[in-house]
Amino acid sequence: MNKKSTAIFLMGPTASGKTDLAIQLHQELPVEVISVDSALIYKGMDIGTAKPNAQELALTPHRLIDIKDPSENYSAAEFRHDALQEMQKITQQGKIPLLVGGTMLYYKALLEGLSPLPSADEKVRLEIEQKAEKFGWATLHNELAKIDPISAQRINPNDSQRINRALEVFYLTGQSLTELTAQKGKEIPYHIIQFAIAPDRAVLHQRIEQRFHKMIEQGFQQEVEKLYQRSDLHPNLPSIRCVGYRQMWEYLQGNYDKDEMIFRGICATRQLAKRQLTWLRGWKSPIEWLDSLNPKSTKEKIIKTIKHNCK
């Protein structure tokens, strides 16, 4: 049996210092960086996403950054496909893939594979919507309860979008959403070493606030104004729903003043960090936690672990 190639996950909440650490590791280890961030994929969204700057990217190139226009969607399945391709290219060069970011759903998809859910079918969705107009979503929720009682219990009777998707999956496959999501895709064909970096809550909150104010100083408002002027962008797109961007967009719409926008942006970023930490604390695979307040010992710990595992 061939020995699996090694890959490294460097996970953590927003503003935890992942990018700086990745750049240091790139200077001392034979690693190439792959971004695992659902916001960094977008072109023209640099300041509000805390994207590495041109100098940092010249020093340490990041793959899967700036690969989509803000008008486009990008799924966890697409990420898995693209990341595995990049990982293969890196290992073929005799180097180690270093996956850095905080989009935990992407890590999960990469690690465990994805359930074999069908793609959306506009014709089927339209038929379900027409049925709902005639009989009401409560009736369709009752139908779902007969087909898939577990999903029906989870989904609010007023949540038309999720009822539609659950019924659509059944109509297309003959299997319930619960049955299909229980099926795992292919696991990642690599030996994964996983690290997580997370400062103390008070430190993280302070960093998030400082970083948001710094983004404002760097021209975050002007960045979002350019997006706001585009006729093809709107608040329901994943790009505009990114933390900070949504609040700035609503400020530009006149929904609240600048101080309120800053307050909401900081709060939303802190909530994102909390969700990311919740994911990490419930992570099934073994994680080595790093001391974010001692960068030197953190870097040395990673280097020692990698060298030991790559003998």
Swiss-Prot record:
Its EC number is 2.5.1.75. The keyword Nucleotide-binding applies. One of its GO terms (biological process) is tRNA modification. Residues 37-40, 161-165, 241-246 are annotated as: Interaction with substrate tRNA. The record marks T103, R125 as: Interaction with substrate tRNA. Keywords: ATP-binding, Magnesium, Nucleotide-binding, Transferase, tRNA processing. Transmembrane segments: none annotated. Substrate binds at T14, A15, S16, G17, K18, T19. Its cofactor is Mg(2+). It comes from the Bacteria. InterPro entries: Dimethylallyltransferase, IPT, P-loop_NTPase. GO terms for molecular function: ATP binding; tRNA dimethylallyltransferase activity. It catalyses: adenosine(37) in tRNA + dimethylallyl diphosphate = N(6)-dimethylallyladenosine(37) in tRNA + diphosphate. It is an enzyme of class 2 (transferase). Pfam families: IPPT. ATP binds at G12, P13, T14, A15, S16, G17, K18, T19. The keyword ATP-binding applies. Monomer. HAMAP family: IPP_trans (MF_00185). Belongs to the IPP transferase family. Catalyzes the transfer of a dimethylallyl group onto the adenine at position 37 in tRNAs that read codons beginning with uridine, leading to the formation of N6-(dimethylallyl)adenosine (i(6)A). This is tRNA dimethylallyltransferase.
